[in-house]
Every structure is written in structure tokens, then in C-alpha cells.
From Swiss-Prot:
The keyword Disulfide bond does not apply. Residues 191-332 form the FCP1 homology domain. Component of the mitochondrial import inner membrane translocase that mediates the translocation of transit peptide-containing proteins across the mitochondrial inner membrane. Keywords: Membrane, Mitochondrion, Mitochondrion inner membrane, Protein transport, Transit peptide, Translocation, Transmembrane, Transmembrane helix, Transport. This is Mitochondrial import inner membrane translocase subunit tim50. Coiled coil: none annotated. GO terms for cellular component: TIM23 mitochondrial import inner membrane translocase complex. The keyword Transmembrane applies. Belongs to the TIM50 family. It is found in: Mitochondrion inner membrane. It is a single-pass membrane protein.
Length: 374
């Protein structure tokens, strides 16, 4: 503002006003006297750009290196981004491949839920009034008694039978769960009773026809003589296998032992003394000393330390094995053997013909008189 006033008052003297032309100084302009000439400059005079100094070779090299490094970094970042994108794409593809249909998940969850419910129900049913006495059974109310007798007890027996069969078939069951509980199938031996026990399959003693309503029984040669002599030193038990109907047991027993003097007792398939048509090796269930137990079987030969297999009897055959075997068994009790198993090992896993020969050799070797010669 001050400069404008000065210009107005002394413009002519300074020389800014000439030829009747008036020039006013703007607020942002300044008057300078340069080389005898008057020039008008703005306060915001633009400075001329400075000339760039030439760069040295070292600076150029440094700049080139930095540029190369930046390019490399950019390239690495681009590659990493591409790899991540590829990985994400592959992951999505895998996820899409392994996507489980909803129906499968629903079926699986339903199955496992059913297994859980069934196992819980089975466990509770198995343990329902498991080890109660007869008096406690009598005190059960009507609902408990009906559930106990119609569901719990049959289910428990069914499960125990399956488990025992698996335990017998697969040894690792004993390793996992320990030896099973052995149920005694015979009463305890009487003090001062007979020292040896003989268990005979009915097929080894007789042939039973099933062509009529009333079965016909054919006795093996020398059966009565065989049993009558051995009953003095042996407990003799007759085993009824699963081929014979249960309602025929008493009838057949009466035909074999009319006076009831031969057999100490009877054994049935339910006792488990035979497994898959073979006498069990768990002789402890007889509650007798295993070293003094002999099984006489009619099945195909198999490995068992206590079994003498004499084969099935056929009524049309001339079979005298019982008469040949009798003196051998009598010699065991007469010698008061502590263990019969080493003696009977030479009569195992052989055919009928070989058994007859081995019996004769045993009698001659031990100077035992044959009943057949008498």
C-alpha cells in the first residue's frame, strides 16, 4: 500500500509513468534499479532451475545396484504372490474334492448314535441283577422278574457264549481280557474216591440209527465188558454230542446202562466240554486233575494230550478196539500212574489199523495179558 502511494506521488520523477500512461504497482510487486534501468519484479519470482551436476560413475553404479535390488524384490514379491494364489487354489480344489455329501454325514452320525444307544442298553441289560441270590430273585416285583427272566438272563447267556467262542478261537482275547471264568461241569471229587476220570463220546461206544421215530442203538463189541471192568477204577462219564436230540438222552442212556451201574454221570453239549467237535483243552472245567483224565473220542484225529481216538463204530464192521484198549487202561490204574498223558501219546493221531497195532505193541512191551486171548 505504501509503495502504491509513493508511485502515485512520485511516479513521474522515478520514471514509471511516461507518455501519459499510468502504471500502478501491485501489492506483490517491488521496484528495483538494475544497471540504470528500472525493472518491476514480483515478490514470488520464480528462480531458474539449477543445472544438474553430472553424476560420477560410482554414484551411477550405486543407483544401478539399488534399482536392480528393487527389481529383484519386486520380482520375488510377485512370485510369492503367485505361489500363494496357486496354493490357495489347490487347497480349495482339495477341499472341494473331499467335501462329504450331507447324506453321508447324517447316515454316519445316525449310525454312531445308534451304536451308542445299543451299547448302553446292552451294558445295562447284561448287568441287570447279575449276581443276585435265589432269595433276591424271589423278591423281584412282577416287572423286574419278567425283564430278568425274558430279556436280561437270555441276553447274558447269549453274550457269554459268543465271547467264550471268540476266546477259544482267538488267543489274543485271553491276552487282552485275561483267562475266562471256568465253569465247573462236574461236582467236586469225593474224598478217597476214584483216582482217574474217563469221558467217552457216545459215538465211540454205539451206532444210533435215525430212520425211525424210535432210534435203534447198536453197541460196540465188548461194550458191557469194557465198562464193567473200568468202573472199579475210573469215574466214567458219557458225553452226548449235538447230533442226538435232547429228548432222547434218557432213552439212550437206559439202553446202554440198563442197571445204572456204569456211568458216574452224563455230560451234554451245553457244558462246553467239546468245542467244534473236539474235546476242550480246558480240562479244569471238569474239576479234576488233568494228568489223570482220559477222553475217548470218535471224531477225526486231532491234537490233544488227553484224547484217544478210536473212531466211529459201524455195526457192520468187525471192530474189537474196546476189548484191545481195556487192558491198557487197566494197567494205568494198576501202575498208579501220576500222569497218563505220556502213556497215551503213542495212541494219538493215528488210524484205526495203526491204533490196533500200537495197542498190541504196548501190551507185549509191558508184558500185559490181552483180554482178547483170554
Amino acid at each position: 500500500m505504501i509503495l502504491n502511494k509513493v508511485a502515485k506521488c512520485y511516479g513521474k520523477q522515478i520514471g514509471f509513468f511516461g507518455n501519459k500512461t499510468t502504471q500502478f504497482i501491485k501489492p506483490n510487486q517491488t521496484i528495483f534499479l538494475i544497471g540504470g534501468t528500472k525493472r518491476l519484479f514480483t515478490t514470488q519470482q520464480q528462480q531458474s532451475p539449477k543445472k544438474e551436476e553430472p553424476k560420477s560413475e560410482q554414484q551411477k553404479k550405486v543407483e544401478d545396484k539399488t534399482e536392480e535390488k528393487e527389481k529383484e524384490k519386486d520380482e520375488e514379491e510377485n512370485e510369492n504372490e503367485k505361489e500363494k494364489e496357486n496354493e490357495d487354489g489347490e487347497g480349495q480344489k482339495k477341499k472341494s474334492k473331499f467335501n462329504v455329501p450331507p447324506i453321508v454325514t447324517s447316515v454316519t452320525s445316525t449310525f454312531f448314535a445308534g451304536v451308542l444307544v445299543a451299547s448302553t442298553f446292552g451294558y445295562l441289560t447284561y448287568n441287570f441283577k447279575k449276581d443276585i441270590s435265589e432269595e433276591e430273585r424271589y423278591r423281584l416285583n412282577s416287572v423286574e422278574s419278567k425283564f430278568y427272566h425274558s430279556i436280561a438272563e437270555p441276553f447274558r447267556e447269549f453274550f457269554d457264549n459268543i465271547f467264550e467262542n471268540l476266546r477259544t478261537k482267538y488267543e489274543f482275547f485271553d491276552m487282552l481280557f485275561g483267562p475266562g471264568k471256568i465253569h465247573k461241569v462236574l461236582p467236586p471229587p469225593l474224598p478217597g474216591g476214584k483216582k482217574y476220570t474217563l469221558v467217552i463220546d457216545i459215538d465211540a461206544l454205539t451206532e444210533i440209527t435215525k430212520t425211525s421215530k424210535y432210534p435203534t442203538l447198536y453197541k460196540r463189541a465188548g461194550l458191557d465188558f469194557f465198562l464193567d471192568h473200568l468202573r472199579k477204577d475210573y469215574e466214567i462219564y458219557l458225553y452226548f454230542n449235538g447230533n442226538i436230540p435232547q429228548n432222547k438222552y434218557e432213552q439212550l442212556q437206559f439202553k446202554i446202562d440198563t442197571n445204572g451201574k456204569y456211568f458216574t454221570g452224563l455230560l451234554y453239549p451245553e457244558t462246553g466240554i467239546k468245542e467244534r467237535n473236539q474235546f476242550s483243552k480246558k480240562i479244569e472245567m471238569l474239576d479234576r486233575d488233568p494228568s489223570k483224565v482220559i477222553f475217548i473220542d470218535a471224531a477225526s484225529p486231532y491234537d490233544h494230550p488227553n484224547v484217544i481216538n478210536i473212531g466211529k463204530f459201524k455195526s457192520n464192521s468187525k471192530d474189537k478196539l474196546l476189548i484191545e484198549l481195556l487192558p491198557v487202561l487197566e494197567s494205568f490204574s494198576r501202575k498208579n500212574l501220576d500222569d497218563v498223558r505220556p502213556e497215551i501219546s503213542q495212541f494219538q493221531n493215528i488210524s484205526k489199523q495203526s491204533l490196533t497195532k500200537n495197542l498190541e505193541d504196548y501190551l507185549s512191551t509191558h508184558n500185559i495179558n490181552s483180554r482178547q486171548k483170554k
